[in-house]
Swiss-Prot record:
GO biological process: prolyl-tRNA aminoacylation
Subunit structure: Homodimer.
Pfam family for this entry, one: tRNA_edit
Protein name (database record): Proline--tRNA ligase
Entry GO CC: cytosol
Top-level enzyme category: ligase
Major site of localization recorded for this protein: cytoplasm
Organism, as annotated: Dechloromonas aromatica (strain RCB)
Domain notes for this protein: Consists of three domains: the N-terminal catalytic domain, the editing domain and the C-terminal anticodon-binding domain.
Key word Coiled coil present: no
Compartment(s) where it occurs, according to its Swiss-Prot or TrEMBL record: Cytoplasm
EC number: 6.1.1.15
Length: 576
């Protein structure tokens, strides 16, 4: 490709409303153009990157035995009503009526459609297992689309669905997809982690997320370098302290703490470390039968509540945070001074994190404005609480596998695999006849990759002050040739054209910058758009038979013999 024949424009500055690095870089580099909030046009340069990601995903899925199909973006409401998700989904499900007043949705996902396809045609265990996937545009009407292609309303996704006659066979395919996803992200050239994850609203049992590591990532990943253990912080178990609870060494006392409501302020006022403070989080659970449970969740002052873990406490599932009025009604004061001491156990349930259950001589709210209790001990000053793991792990915690300490990494979720089991198959009556002729519900797996999201995540991982740094496998071009004086020097033009032809002949994805621009402009553009390898051809070097080579991450260029440049580039690209 020659730049004179290519349609791309670059910007010196990113638009003011661009929020994250990838969004800024993609707009500046001309990868995308904003059409509306959360909706983008993929320009030729960005589309080259997107298609390279898509092709790697497709190759590996095909190699793994999955079959590609293409389902409709527009789905009939009847399928969503049959599965129960018509009511469960919120406003992010874009619904509309056609001219005949029939209801449809723009698909944010395709569990209903694929299950309908399979239930129509698969009747016998002899037709199972089957794994079908597509790469298709989806739409979710996000309330606040942000971060460019990272959280847009329209996005390109690979979603695959497998159907099985047994759970054991589902687990086999799940392992196959785990390995396939690992190969995909390795081929893409990305630093990533596969982590155990919560299944969330999609349901099912086992689940793993695949995260591209980046400091700007939205998700926290707990990782043990000694063992390779990895899990989303939402799921990682916080182990109970090994040491026994220390004996009480002081009496409980009510202490005046005027205006000190936050744990950090209380700790500073009392001149105590934050891990000596117990914070009480008031929650309310309302059951379908109309019963209510008001509860205090106790955590150490330096720990954060893990809502997913807390929601697994049966007595308060589901729960919401209590209102100020509800707190005052049951505890007699506003949040900030509430605690588990001297409460009516018939009105207030208490659940403590493992770390709190191990504390002695701690500080908590006194249920009186402006006061906290100090020197509090379980068993003496208040009953022993029910104990659960309800906090997020932190760096330095023991790894749940017992083989080291946890580190916390930041990641961007780009893939997710689920063992759905029978949730959708049962709702949509997706059944088969087993070898005895008995009707059985199929087991399902679900496997998603955010294809367009990968592009944004790769840029979040690879960038500097000059622009985008992409792995060669997904860069818009592998090599750029920048001739100095292409339109003025016949020698430069001839050498550039010859190198361009030689590289194209051996299959290198190369771009020749034949614009009549200043060298500084060409250098800046090629660095901004993220081309891994650059060859500069000038009259001075040609006199000595030399080209200038520089990789995107090199600090300084090196001079390479004109006769060696193709071999050098081949070696660099093969090693990538």
């Amino acid at each position: 490709m020659r730049t004179s024949q290519f349609f791309f424009t670059t910007l010196k500055e990113a638009p003011a409303d661009a929020e994250v690095i990838s969004q800024k870089m993609m707009l500046r580099a001309g990868y995308i153009k904003r059409a509306a909030a959360g909706i983008y046009t993929w320009m030729p340069l960005g589309l080259r990157v997107l298609r390279k990601v898509e092709n790697i995903v497709r190759e590996e899925m095909n190699n793994a035995g999955a079959l590609e199909l293409l389902m409709p973006a527009v789905q009939p409401a009847e399928l969503w009503q049959e599965s129960g998700r018509w009511e469960q989904y919120g406003p992010e499900l874009l619904r509309f009526k056609d001219r005949h007043q029939r209801e449809f949705v723009i698909g944010p996902t395709h569990e209903e459609v694929i299950t309908d396809v399979v239930r129509r045609d698969v009747k016998s265990y002899r037709q199972l297992p089957i794994h079908l996937y597509q790469i298709q545009t989806k739409f979710r009407d996000e309330i606040r689309p942000r971060f460019g292609v990272m959280r847009g309303r329209e996005f390109l996704m690979k979603d695959g669905y497998s159907f099985h006659a047994s759970f054991d066979d589902l687990k086999r395919e799940y392992g196959n997809m785990y390995d396939t996803y690992s190969r995909i992200f390795s081929r893409l050239g990305l630093k990533f982690r596969a982590v155990a994850a919560d299944t969330g609203s999609i349901g099912g049992t086992g689940s793993h997320e695949f995260h591209v590591l980046a400091d700007s990532g939205e998700d926290d990943i707990a990782f043990c370098p000694d063992s390779g253990y990895a899990a989303n912080v939402e799921l990682a178990e916080a182990m109970a302290p090994n040491e026994a609870r220390a004996a009480a060494s002081t009496l409980m006392e009510k202490t005046h703490t005027p205006g000190k409501m936050a744990c950090a302020d209380v700790a500073k006022f009392l001149e105590l470390p934050l891990d000596r403070i117990v914070k009480s989080i008031a929650v309310m659970s309302e059951k379908e039968d109309g019963s209510q449970t008001f509860a205090l969740l106790l955590l150490r002052g330096d720990h954060e509540l893990n809502e997913i873990k807390a929601s697994k406490i049966a007595a308060i599932n589901p729960f919401r945070f209590a209102t100020e009025e509800e707190v005052i009604e049951r505890l007699g004061c506003k949040p900030g001074f509430i605690g588990p001491v001297a409460i009516d156990a018939t009105k207030v349930a208490v659940f403590a994190d493992r770390s709190v259950a191990n504390m002695s001589d701690f500080v908590c709210g006194a249920n009186e404005a402006g006061y906290h209790m100090t020197g509090v001990n379980f068993g003496r000053d208040l009953p022993e609480p029910e104990v659960f793991d309800i906090r997020n792990v932190v760096a330095g915690d023991a790894s749940p596998d017992g083989q080291g300490k946890l580190e916390i990494l930041r990641g961007i979720e780009v893939g997710h695999i689920f063992q759905l089991r029978q949730k959708y198959a049962e709702a949509l009556n997706c059944v088969y006849l087993d070898d005895s002729g008995k009707s059985q519900i199929m087991e399902m797996g679900c496997y998603g990759i955010g294809v367009s999201r990968i592009v944004g995540a790769a840029i979040e991982q690879g960038n500097d002050d000059k622009g985008i740094i992409l792995p060669p496998a997904i860069a818009p071009f592998e090599v750029c040739i920048v001739p100095m004086g292409y339109h003025k020097s016949e020698a430069v033009k001839a050498s550039a054209d010859q190198l361009y032809a030689d590289l194209k002949k051996i299959g290198v994805d190369v771009v020749l910058d034949d614009r009549n621009e200043r060298p500084g402009v060409m250098f800046a553009d090629m660095e901004l758009i993220g081309i891994p390898h650059r060859v500069v051809i000038g009259e001075r070097g040609l006199k000595d038979g030399l080209f200038e080579y520089k990789s995107r991450i090199d600090a300084e260029p090196t001079m390479v013999a004109q006769t060696d440049i193709v071999t050098l580039l081949q070696g660099k690209l093969c090693a990538a």
